[in-house]
């Protein structure tokens, strides 16, 4: 499948967040190529979104968010877990999509070796920190161009048929913005990090 072009990311973030479901996230490692089907995302949109890192303006940490769409924004949470975001919308507008979970489709043995505590297929990348661990995504990739066939990129894939939209996870501090239904996941995937209430 072809690598997604920059135009894919240069669109409203909510559209990109939904359309990334079903696409293939690829990481080229010394041990070989590993790939995940993206099954869960979250949208973070601009300085008016209190859950967004850009809500208080540009900093050294979030500078990539203000740049060109189609680049990786990687940051650390809890001092130990990396999180991968893909920058969206026009250059200068801070928005991105967090890749929350993925389903292993290639190089599962390599990913399992990077996440030895994950004993089952659906546990390998069922969360943003787990996903980055399984694909060896670190802050060294912050700012990487995912529209080029380099170390990290996204390939096209079939659209997801049933998408669940619900509030984002871990953003209670954001007030009313915490209630926005800006988390999206593939209803039929067993690899999502957490299902919405009532979705069994």
Curated annotation (Swiss-Prot):
It is an enzyme of class 3 (hydrolase). GO terms for molecular function: alkylbase DNA N-glycosylase activity; DNA binding. One of its GO terms (biological process) is base-excision repair. Its EC number is 3.2.2.-. Keywords: DNA damage, DNA repair, Hydrolase. SUPFAM superfamilies: FMT C-terminal domain-like. It comes from the Archaea. Belongs to the DNA glycosylase MPG family. NCBIfam families: 3mg, PRK00802.1-3. This is Putative 3-methyladenine DNA glycosylase. It comes from Methanocella arvoryzae (strain DSM 22066 / NBRC 105507 / MRE50).
């Amino acid at each position: 499948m072809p690598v997604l072009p920059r135009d894919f990311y240069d669109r409203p973030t909510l559209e990109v967040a939904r359309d990334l479901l079903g696409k293939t996230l690829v990481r080229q490692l010394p041990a070989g190529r590993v790939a995940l089907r993206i099954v869960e995302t979250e949208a973070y949109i601009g300085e008016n979104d209190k859950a967004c890192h850009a809500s208080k303006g540009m900093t050294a940490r979030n500078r990539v968010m203000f740049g060109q769409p189609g680049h990786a924004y990687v940051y650390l949470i809890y001092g130990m877990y990396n999180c991968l975001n893909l920058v969206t919308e026009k250059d200068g507008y801070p928005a991105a999509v967090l890749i929350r979970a993925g389903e292993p489709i290639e190089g599962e043995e390599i990913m399992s070796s990077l996440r030895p505590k994950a004993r089952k297929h659906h546990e390998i990348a069922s969360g943003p920190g787990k996903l980055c661990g399984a694909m060896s995504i670190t802050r060294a990739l912050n700012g990487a161009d995912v529209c080029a066939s380099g170390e990290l990129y996204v390939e096209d894939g079939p659209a997801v048929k049933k998408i669940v939209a619900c509030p984002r996870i871990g953003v209670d501090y954001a007030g009313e913005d915490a209630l926005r239904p800006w988390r999206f996941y593939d209803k039929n995937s067993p690899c999502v990090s957490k299902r919405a209430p009532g979705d069994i």
